[in-house]
Amino acid sequence: MRITELLTKDTIAMDLSSSDKNGVIDELVHQLDKAGKLSDVPSFKEAIHNRESQSTTGIGEGIAIPHAKVSAVKSPAIAFGKSKAGVDYQSLDMQPAHLFFMIAAPEGGAQTHLDALAKLSGILMDENVREKLINASSPEEVLQIIDAADDEATKEEEAEANENSTVSTDNSNQDN
């Protein structure tokens, strides 16, 4: 799965105006709804808030990844928003969040939201990617940055898989 299968131009908000966590959630939910991804906005918003009440999705390094898997979602999607000023998102590192990725998955969506969460987290560990996203000036640029980082992550996963299969082949030869 590629992030840009779920993140599209119509789910990107380049300049969030909210100054608090609830406002950011409202803006990102609106972005998903405007793109036709939600069938029940209040239910989806409630699911996001319920998830946030369990523990913050402000993971630190200026990133928040609110997410919910609920029947109010028509099709899996990711909304992206950024705030140059930063928002107190009650992040784990107590720093303001600047980059927001809201993952919306339908209730029967299998592993989609977990796969997206894992892949996004991996991509966003790269400080260079975060910096490029903060400075991006258009939805197209955001998609290019994510796509390039996704390509890089895929190459690294493939190289690691090849390395592991070589190691296991080497180990099995030692038994003979």
Regions found by a protein language model. Give the residues of each.
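Cytosolic covalent-transfer regions centered on His/Cys nucleophiles
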Residues: 1-176
